[in-house]
A protein has these predicted regions:
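Beta-lactam-recognizing serine transpeptidase/beta-lactamase-like catalytic domain environment
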Residues: 2-7, 11, 83, 211-223, ...
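Periplasmic/cell-envelope proteins involved in peptidoglycan metabolism and beta-lactam response
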Residues: 1-286, 374-386, 395, 503-507, ...
């Protein structure tokens, strides 16, 4: 028994040793397999397919930072700033970072932020809590640097600052309708800002960085330089713009008018030197301003041009040989198609100069009826009526121009004194710039151009010169535009008055007063159009309402630009032969 027990014990010990050895080997094998699997997995992830992990890691740590570039500056023709960008800050929050740090509390620092942003603390918390896992939300835009620095010093978790810019307009309401404005993202919304948005907007740069869990930059990965925006030099002369706006604004207030517009053009280049509207608005703070008040009426509003087209009627009649400059017309009122054609005052006879000076509807209508119906249509079209000026400003209208094959006599007659078509003040300014260049048509420009500017001759120079000379009589004693006269200077103008058209297409008891012309008449340098819409102070004729504004503006322009006076010397006789019939005085 003892021998058997002795042999059994070593056997068990041997079996136990074998078991331990096998188990150890199994364990080692498992470990080796695990290590092999892990090494294989690591090799797979690092060598064969690393993109996913790299992508996930980059999503957690890489950030793209925009390197902003300022919007281009807008200046007048002499470099005076009309729109500039000033540096400001945007305040933004990282909701996730903020919540991870404990969220918004009643701490004095959070109350200070609330006061700085003028936002109640509960509203601030509500905005941040709307998306607790979000990483970006604006709290305030275009914050001035001092306030932004104050907020930065609060050192609030999850609250960050970002560089941006805000547009500032030094001329304010003087150039508001022309320059327009941008939105909070520096995108052009109105005026030149919108029309030239691409030119004024640079290409932002980009910086890719790696951040740690606390948002600190630990590595610069790459960067792309920003491309600077272009500056824009306009044709506008800020001095003349201010002058035009001041006189126009005063006239609108004095005449209790609905609105007014004025456009000043350089005859030799087609450059728009001033374009103003009244009432205006402050582009630096237009909160509460009605959208309707922001439109540039000089390019968007259309009216029947009234008597301002009469010089073109006389030119057409002279060109076609219907009359000569010494012709005397019978201007007694007459009826046509059941309608009476008459003037404000009665004249039995008028020369062509008298027709313009007294603004005779009878005279120009007889000239129109003596010509083919297509004659005036062609002339008006040559001078640009019915065609957009292509100035480049968004919102410009091309007016309304008749497209008729057959015209009744009454339509032909009224067409000669500005009814049956509609134009913008800018289109009318282009007409008079062409008259001022003695029949050379040049495209208008809102940007500065270098002379000489070639043009297209659309009318014989001799005829246009003759009519310009006739137009001088309008501002002389006895003329309908005598209130536009400028001491020391000769001016060639035409006043006009037209009834307004209501929403239903019918004429209403409201009027538009015009005065358009060029100066100095001896060698025209500037063309000016003044439009006063719906004057309510008791007078509505162009000679009484818009003519004084024309004189004030053009006189200021001539003196500002140091144009030498060209008026006739005292005692020198004028060669005008105007009225050979009855009647005195004239209004238009």
């Amino acid at each position: 028994m003892k021998a058997a027990a002795k042999t059994l014990k070593p056997k068990r010990q041997e079996e136990q040793a074998n078991f331990v050895s096998w188990r150890f080997a199994l364990l080692c094998g498992c470990i080796l397999l695990a290590l092999g699997f892990l090494l294989g997995r690591v090799a797979w992830l690092q060598i064969v397919a690393p993109d996913m992990l790299v992508r996930q890691g980059d999503m957690r740590s890489l950030r793209v930072q925009e390197v902003s570039t300022s919007r281009g500056m807008i200046t007048d023709r002499s470099g005076r700033p009309l729109a500039v960008s000033v540096p400001v800050k945007a305040i933004w929050a990282d909701p996730k970072e903020l919540h991870d740090a404990g969220g918004i509390t009643l701490d004095n620092r959070w109350k200070a932020l609330s006061d700085a942003l003028k936002m109640p603390l509960d509203q601030l918390a509500s905005r941040v809590n709307a998306n607790p896992k979000g990483r970006f939300i604006y709290l305030a835009r275009q914050v001035n640097p001092d306030m932004a620095d104050y907020i930065r010093k609060l050192k609030l978790p999850g609250i960050h600052l970002r560089e941006e810019s805000r547009r500032y307009y030094p001329s304010g309401e003087v150039t508001a309708h022309l320059i327009g404005f941008t939105n909070v993202d520096s995108q052009g919304i109105e005026g030149v800002e919108k029309s030239f948005d691409k030119w004024l907007t640079g290409q932002p740069g980009e910086r890719i960085v790696r951040k740690d869990r606390y948002g600190r930059v630990i590595e610069d990965i790459s960067s792309t330089d920003s491309q600077a925006a272009h500056n824009l030099a306009l044709s506008i002369d800020e001095r003349l713009q201010a002058l035009v706006y001041r006189e126009l604004n005063n006239a609108v207030a004095f005449n209790k008018a609905e609105s007014g517009s004025a456009v000043l053009v350089d005859v030799s280049t087609g450059e728009v030197l001033a374009m103003a509207n009244s009432p205006s608005y402050n582009p630096n703070n237009f909160t509460g301003t009605a959208k309707d008040a922001m439109r540039n009426r000089a390019i968007t509003d259309v009216f029947e041009p009234g008597s301002t087209v009469k010089p073109m009627v006389v030119m057409t009649a002279l060109q076609r040989g219907i009359v000569n400059e010494n012709t005397v017309l019978n201007t007694i009122p007459y009826r046509i198609n059941g309608h009476e054609i008459k003037d404000v005052a009665r004249y039995s006879e008028l020369t062509l100069t008298g027709v313009l000076q007294k603004s005779s509807n009878v005279g120009v209508s007889k000239l129109a009826l003596a010509m083919p119906s297509s004659a005036l249509v062609e002339t008006y079209s040559r001078f640009g009526l019915g065609k957009a000026t292509n100035l480049g400003l968004v919102g410009e209208r091309s007016g309304l121009y008749p497209q008729k094959q057959r015209w009744s006599d009454i339509e032909r007659a009224t067409f000669s004194f500005g009814y049956g078509l509609m134009v913008t003040p800018l289109q009318l300014a282009r007409v008079y710039a062409t008259i001022g260049s003695y029949g050379v048509y040049r495209p208008l420009s809102i940007t500065k151009v270098d002379p000489p500017v070639p043009g297209e001759r659309i009318f014989p120079e001799s005829i246009v010169r003759t009519v310009v000379h006739m137009m001088e009589s309008v501002a002389l004693p006895g003329g309908g535009g005598v209130k536009a006269a400028i001491k020391g200077y000769r001016i060639a103008i035409k006043t006009g008055t037209a009834k307004k058209v209501g929403p239903d297409g019918r004429y209403i008891n409201k009027y538009i007063a015009y005065t358009a012309g060029v100066a100095p008449a001896s060698n025209p340098r500037f063309a000016l159009v003044v439009v006063i819409n719906d004057p309510q102070a008791g007078k509505y004729y162009g000679g009484a309402v818009s003519a004084p504004v024309f004189g004030a503006i053009m006189g200021g322009v001539l003196r500002t630009m140091n144009i030498e006076p060209d008026a006739l010397a005292t005692g020198e006789k004028s060669e005008f032969v105007i009225n050979q019939g009855e009647g005195t005085g004239g209004r238009s």
